[in-house]
From Swiss-Prot:
It comes from the Bacteria. The gene is mtnK. This is Methylthioribose kinase. Pathway: Amino-acid biosynthesis; L-methionine biosynthesis via salvage pathway; S-methyl-5-thio-alpha-D-ribose 1-phosphate from S-methyl-5'-thioadenosine (hydrolase route): step 2/2. Its EC number is 2.7.1.100. Belongs to the methylthioribose kinase family.
């Protein structure tokens, strides 16, 4: 008989007392539920002084806003905890610390990050963290290299691919990224004024062929243990620090997906800035986002290449020049997935505040159109792209379009 039951606030406090690793467990007295609560229950556990000490997170067996007609596997809580633990093994400085997890209860206890801020909110407010892009690139390199064939033995990786198989959460990604935006689907959500742009995407045969290729790689290429949902809302920042959270979409997939999703969220902010700030601040912020895109990729690529030279275990993959060749393939994937993120966050089910929080209706629509055109252009140009500098230069020169020529 399963021990699973949905936690109350009192349950969360008691659980934190047992597994929160605090010096005085009885000082933990209250729990505040945070988040929207549609997929998970998340509690901040506070002590007698009102200070948040740890986080208790429990997976729900269905999407609460829909009900039991949309069930979800509780095993995603195990996958999330183990993904975070694995990533923490190789990059502890940029991964939230898991203090305890219980697969049967679908619950885990995490360190409290109240002294950090959600990166998306900070980007929207115009608050700049100069270390964040480099630290994100470091996180991506460390976690993706050490869970790839470059470092893991073939036997260990095959076992890990099986252990991290995550079909229900992957199905959500497959639908929301690669299917829904290009068909008439009830999950899609967009301003009716954007219908001409939406219809243009649906009728673009070259675009749909490119998206089909991206989806096929997502389905079939088990290159490394991905975070699976690495956007600016799942990243916390503070002065000199960065931590990733929310890895329930973790699975073995194409390395470029994590990188492209991260870059896509920087470019969503780039597209939204004209509606979020005055002209001078928006221009400066947009230039900084492009520099951030360069920094994330360049840090990732340099570190991944260095790690492959130092630590590659397989003699064939350690062949001089192969890692650099492989990174070209990752880069092209990343640009395609980046474009997919721009499109799906604009007209699909799950939007971002970088665009939706723009008050001026006409400006919001203009920024959304820019995100759609840039997303389409990136997907189409991806097979012809050689380096990040070329892409960034073309975005600067032609803010709303790219042409599929070699960069």
């Amino acid at each position: 008989m399963s021990r699973y039951h949905t936690f109350t606030a009192a349950d969360a406090v008691e659980y934190a007392r047992q597994f929160g690793q605090v010096a005085d467990p009885q000082a933990l007295v209250t729990a505040d539920e945070i988040g929207d609560g549609n997929l998970n229950l998340v509690f901040k556990i506070r002590d007698t002084a009102g200070i948040s000490r740890v986080i208790v997170k429990q997976a729900l067996p269905y999407v609460r806003c829909v009900g039991e007609s949309w069930p979800l596997t509780l095993d995603r809580a195990r996958i999330e905890a183990e993904t975070l633990l694995t990533h923490s093994q190789f990059c502890p400085q940029h991964t939230v610390k898991v203090l305890h997890h219980d697969a049967e209860l679908a619950v885990m206890v995490q360190e409290d990050l109240s002294d950090h801020h959600i990166w998306r909110h900070e980007l929207i407010q115009g608050n700049y963290y100069p270390q964040a892009a480099e630290q994100l690139g470091e996180y991506l390199a460390q976690t993706l290299f050490h869970t790839s064939d470059f470092y893991q033995s073939a036997q260990a990786k095959k076992a890990a691919v099986s252990r991290y198989t995550n079909p229900e959460l992957c199905q959500i990604t497959e639908d929301l990224f690669f299917t829904d935006p290009y068909i008439d689907h009830e999950r899609n959500n967009f301003d009716p004024v954007l219908l001409p742009e939406v219809l243009s995407l649906r009728q673009d045969k070259a675009l749909k062929l490119a998206v089909a290729s991206l989806k096929h790689r997502f389905l079939s290429q088990a290159e490394a243990l991905l975070h699976g949902d690495i956007h600016s809302g799942s990243i916390f920042v503070a002065d000199g620090r960065l931590k990733t959270i929310d890895a329930e979409f973790g699975f073995y997939g194409p390395i470029g997906f994590d990188i492209g999703t991260a870059l896509g969220n920087l470019l969503l902010n780039y597209c939204g800035l004209p509606g979020l700030a005055g002209p001078r601040d928006a221009a400066a912020g947009r230039e900084q986002r492009l520099k951030d895109v360069q920094t994330v990729w360049q840090t990732f690529a340099a570190r991944f290449l260095a790690l492959s030279q130092e630590k590659a275990q397989d003699p064939a993959l350690a062949t001089e020049g192969y890692a650099a060749q492989f990174l070209q393939h990752v880069w092209r994937d990343a640009i395609g997935y980046c474009g997919s993120e721009l499109i799906r966050r604009t007209i699909g089910l799950a939007h971002v505040a970088d665009l939706d929080s723009i008050d001026d209706e006409e400006m919001r629509r203009a920024c959304q159109r820019h995100a759609l055109s840039l997303g389409r252009a990136l997907i189409l140009v991806a097979p012809h792209v050689d380096d990040v500098g070329g892409v960034v230069a073309r975005i600067r020169q032609s803010p709303s379009s790219l042409t599929p020529q070699r960069c």
